[in-house]
């Protein structure tokens, strides 16, 4: 009979069991082809598995989408940072060739710290990266401007210059003009990445949802008892939804928190649209160059302020120069030129990938609320 074949196909009964019918103890389906204790247990497990599987399979699909969008967005922002770094090296080499070798490592450290700051748990990691950059840039700039023909500064004097930078303020208001909008954009990107990570972790946890034991009997009665009595009629839709909603109720409670997450992600997207992060990163090299120019123009004033805080300079008495760093390469110039041409495309990619991530989070809202319907539609 078709019903018996269905039971055999789903491994709810086997031929040996059928040969022993009729049996005793049909607690789940009340007799028929399923009346034995071992089949009752098999039915309970099958009912529990049926409910759990719809959660696992759909959760893993949503988890994959969230992590994919997260990785794509990070890749786009990281690419914008890399392009900005290449362009910064080009600008410094063209504008300050004497300073460029020493500035190269300082610039590299800045962009590396910004990349790390995008995913750092420390809320002030990005601000610290910018502050450290201005501290580190001052010693080579001051050496290049006032003492270019002398030996490198001693380590102690270099540290004094780093500490004095925030008092001397050699860059004028450029750090504020550069830092505030750039940090807003980077913090928005960081918040989006964090939100996607949180969403993916919540969904991953949900994929391991343990179906309550009492739901095994209800799911089995709904899905398999008809076959036990010789019919393959599908379960009543109303009964199916009632069982699924009751058994999956703990997951539905997440819907409210997920709505809050979706709202936060949407606001982050709006912030990214306002600040135009890729454009800010493209303009950053010019702003850094402008800061150095401000320091150059203030050379005599800087010297007075520095000597007040650090006295006369002391120099390294060895032939090793702490500013001797790898020279700027032709390949780097070419890469920077290509990066400049891609500014507009970079802005579009950041916003496009952010929008796709927001849509994925919105889709998650439907997932939490729609699990019972998904389960019943799959039967």
Kindly label every feature range from the protein language model.
Residues 1-48, 55, 66, 255-379:
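Eukaryotic terminal intrinsically disordered regions
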Residues 80-84, 104, 166, 173, ...:
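Membrane-targeting and insertion segments and their boundary/processing signals
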Residues 161-168, 180:
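Hydrophobic, helix-prone linear segments
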Residues 91-98, 111-152, 176-277, 289, ...:
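Extended amphipathic alpha-helical scaffold segments
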Residues 1-161, 350, 357, 373-374, ...:
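Eukaryotic N-terminal, low-complexity and coiled-coil-prone scaffolding/targeting segments
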Residues 130, 167, 254, 363-364:
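Acidic, low-complexity intrinsically disordered regions
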């Amino acid at each position: 009979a078709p019903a018996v074949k269905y039971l055999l196909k789903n491994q709810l009964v086997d031929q040996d069991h059928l040969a022993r019918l009729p049996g005793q103890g049909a607690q789940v389906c009340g007799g028929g082809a399923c009346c034995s204790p071992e089949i009752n247990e098999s039915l309970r497990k099958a009912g529990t598995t049926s409910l759990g599987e719809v959660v696992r399979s759909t959760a893993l699909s949503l988890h994959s989408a969230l992590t994919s969008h997260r990785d794509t967005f990070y890749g786009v922002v990281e690419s914008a940072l890399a392009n900005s770094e290449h362009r910064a090296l080009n600008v410094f080499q063209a504008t300050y060739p004497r300073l460029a070798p020493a500035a190269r490592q300082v610039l590299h450290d800045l962009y590396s710290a910004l990349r790390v700051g995008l995913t750092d748990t420390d809320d002030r990691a990005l601000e610290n990266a910018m502050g450290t950059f201005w501290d580190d840039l001052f010693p080579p700039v001051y050496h290049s401007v006032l003492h270019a023909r002398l030996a490198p500064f001693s380590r102690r004097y270099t540290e004094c210059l780093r500490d004095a930078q925030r008092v001397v303020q050699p860059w004028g208001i450029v750090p504020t003009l550069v830092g505030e909008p750039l940090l807003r954009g980077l913090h928005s990107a960081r918040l989006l990445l964090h939100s996607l990570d949180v969403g993916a972790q919540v969904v991953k946890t949900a994929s391991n949802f343990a179906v309550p034991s009492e739901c095994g009997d209800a799911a089995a009665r709904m899905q398999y008892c008809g076959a036990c009595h010789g019919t393959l009629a599908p379960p009543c839709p109303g009964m199916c939804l009632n069982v699924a909603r009751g058994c999956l109720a703990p997951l539905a409670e997440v819907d409210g928190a997920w709505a809050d997450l979706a709202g936060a992600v949407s606001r982050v997207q709006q912030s990214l649209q306002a600040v135009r992060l890729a454009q800010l990163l493209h303009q950053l090299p010019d702003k850094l160059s402008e800061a150095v120019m401000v320091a150059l123009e203030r050379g005599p004033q800087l010297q007075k302020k520095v000597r007040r805080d650090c006295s006369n300079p002391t120099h390294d008495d060895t032939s090793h120069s702490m500013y001797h760093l790898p020279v700027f390469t032709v390949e780097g110039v070419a890469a920077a030129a290509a990066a400049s041409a891609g500014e507009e495309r970079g802005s579009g990619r950041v916003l496009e990938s952010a929008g796709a991530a927001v849509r994925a989070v919105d889709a998650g809202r439907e997932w939490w609320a729609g699990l019972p319907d998904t389960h019943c539609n799959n039967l």
